[in-house]
């Protein structure tokens, strides 16, 4: 009897201890649970801010590197004054004309673009007045790529600071999700700056490259536009491209008007680079209708001019990746030239043999000369860059963990 009483008391003590432990554990668990509800977003925000801060620093470093690349083209011994001038000019901006009254908007845009072009020319003349015309153009477009990268770095930094200042998790998350694409674009801008200052062809140069493949002797017929005549499939063709091999875009609208003033044109064929969809092969070719030209202003003026004449317009595009248009031309894009030429032949055959046609290689002429003899030089540069790219990829693969 006594033993059973002692045993029951011992069991009761154990049960009380267990019960007390369960209560303490439950209280601790609830405290931790509610603490984490408040602390987890803070921890997550801190991690996100750390990551986006690193990305912002990387992009800012790229921006500084792009400035150095351009400055070295001006002078190998970069002075502090030159560096400051380029850095100040990299904040250059263009205000879009008012569109409240759409009448005359295209002319407003054209006027603004011409003003921008003049301002770039003036700045290059100021910092590199002793350079040749071709070198000035390379510096000019190198600065444009530098400005693009500078703006990207400033926008990223703006949102990083916004997330920090207001401790805003949503801003940090949205930015962090977009950063892989933004960094890819930033990388393409610095590669573009390098391509421009070295006079290399870029992805957007495929149109002028195709046009140059038809040119024997060319002459300038409008602002920065070279023209040549050739016969394709028995039809007389006027071939146009921006002046090269230094970077130019040219005034295609003026060139078209000059030719059509003296000749009866039956068809216009445009060749340009176009952004591919993910999954499509870079360098693939497609055809359609309409004037293939990016940007705004000049295309609208051309379309207004041609629509009044009910002119058939064919478009042939070479598909390039999201960032391929500004980076040095890849081998896939270069190898599309014969395919584009086949598309041109088919388009030309849709007109009578007595008809005259205008063929326009739309795009930046960086690295592309003004006749077919220059094509071999382009091939050498593309092969050199392709070899360099493969070596870098092999080095990265060798240095990886797997």
Task: Give names to the regions the model predicted.
Residues 50-209, 213-217:
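Electropositive, gly/pro-rich neighborhoods at or near active sites that engage anionic ligands
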Residues 1, 6, 88-92, 401:
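Intrinsic disorder/low-structure terminal segments
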Residues 360:
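PRPP/pyrophosphate-binding module of the type I phosphoribosyltransferase fold
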Residues 3, 42, 58, 72, ...:
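Arginine residue identity/basic-tract feature
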Residues 44-47, 218:
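Membrane-interfacial segments
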Residues 1, 6-16, 20-45:
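N-terminal signal-anchor transmembrane alpha helix of single-pass membrane proteins
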Residues 155-329, 334-339, 345-346, 353, ...:
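Conserved mixed alpha/beta catalytic, RNA-binding, or beta-rich assembly cores of soluble enzyme
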């Amino acid at each position: 009897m006594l033993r059973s009483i002692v045993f029951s008391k011992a069991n009761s003590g154990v049960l009380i201890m267990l019960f007390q432990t369960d209560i303490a554990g439950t209280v601790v668990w609830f405290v931790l649970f509610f603490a984490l509800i408040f602390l987890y977003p803070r921890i997550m925000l801190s991690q996100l801010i750390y990551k986006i801060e690193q990305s912002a620093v990387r992009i800012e470093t790229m921006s500084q590197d792009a400035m150095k690349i351009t400055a070295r083209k001006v002078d190998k011994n970069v002075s502090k004054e030159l560096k400051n001038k380029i850095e100040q000019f990299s904040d250059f901006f263009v205000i879009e004309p008012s569109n409240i009254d759409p009448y005359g908007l295209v002319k407003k845009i054209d006027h603004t673009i011409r003003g921008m072009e003049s301002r770039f020319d003036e700045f290059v003349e100021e910092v590199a007045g002793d350079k040749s015309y071709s070198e000035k153009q390379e510096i000019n477009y190198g600065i444009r790529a530098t400005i693009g990268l500078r703006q990207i770095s400033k926008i990223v930094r703006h949102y990083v600071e916004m997330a920090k200042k207001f401790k805003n998790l949503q801003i940090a998350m949205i930015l962090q999700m977009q950063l892989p694409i933004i960094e890819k674009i930033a990388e393409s801008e610095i590669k573009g700056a390098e391509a421009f200052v070295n006079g290399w062809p870029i992805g957007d140069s495929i149109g002028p490259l195709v046009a140059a493949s038809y040119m024997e002797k060319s002459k300038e017929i409008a602002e920065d536009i070279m023209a040549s005549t050739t016969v394709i499939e028995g039809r007389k063709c006027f071939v146009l491209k921006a002046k090269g091999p230094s970077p130019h875009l040219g005034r295609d609208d003026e060139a078209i008007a000059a030719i059509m003033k003296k000749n009866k044109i039956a068809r216009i064929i445009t060749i340009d680079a176009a952004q591919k969809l993910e999954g499509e092969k870079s360098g693939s070719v497609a055809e359609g209708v309409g004037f293939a030209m990016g940007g705004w202003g000049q295309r609208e003026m051309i379309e207004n001019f041609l629509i009044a004449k009910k002119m058939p317009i064919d478009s042939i595009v070479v598909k390039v990746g999201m960032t391929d248009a500004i980076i040095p031309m890849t081998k896939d894009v270069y190898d599309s030239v014969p395919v584009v030429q086949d598309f041109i032949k088919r388009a030309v055959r849709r007109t009578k043999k007595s008809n005259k046609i205008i063929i326009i290689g739309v795009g930046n002429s960086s690295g592309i000369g003004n006749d077919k003899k220059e094509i071999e030089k382009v091939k050498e540069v593309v092969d050199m860059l392709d070899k360099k790219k493969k070596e870098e990829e092999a080095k990265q693969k060798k240095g990886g963990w797997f």
